[in-house]
Amino acid sequence: MRSIWVTFSKEGIHKYPGVDTDPKLATGNWDDVSFLGYSHRHIFHFKVWIEVFHDDRDIEFIQFKRWLERLYGNDELQLDHKSCEMIADDLAVTIQEKYPNRYIKISVAEDNENGCEMEYPDNYSDNFINQVI
């Protein structure tokens, strides 16, 4: 498969509801992460790959990156309860609406330390929408 990729970063705020009452997560020991239940800030780092069908700027890098950045505006992202995986899923649906029938891979990382890498087949948004309905 042939693809291009772009990167960008956005400041965002999110939280992990219920983490403070889940005994697997609110342990009171070295592995306690109950603090994640409070709104907290990250720099979310995105890397987005998209399938292209030829080698002469099928999708131009800079235009694709600028379009992705504009999706999120200039303010910090208010993500509420969304995980990196949920952020990637939402972005994949939006990308496939503009660029249908293309394989997409999205990496979303918190502070470039921890994150996810998600792969979406060329019909992901159709399947995702059918699951929601």
Regions found by a protein language model. Name each.
Residues 1-133:
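Charge-rich, low-complexity N-terminal segments
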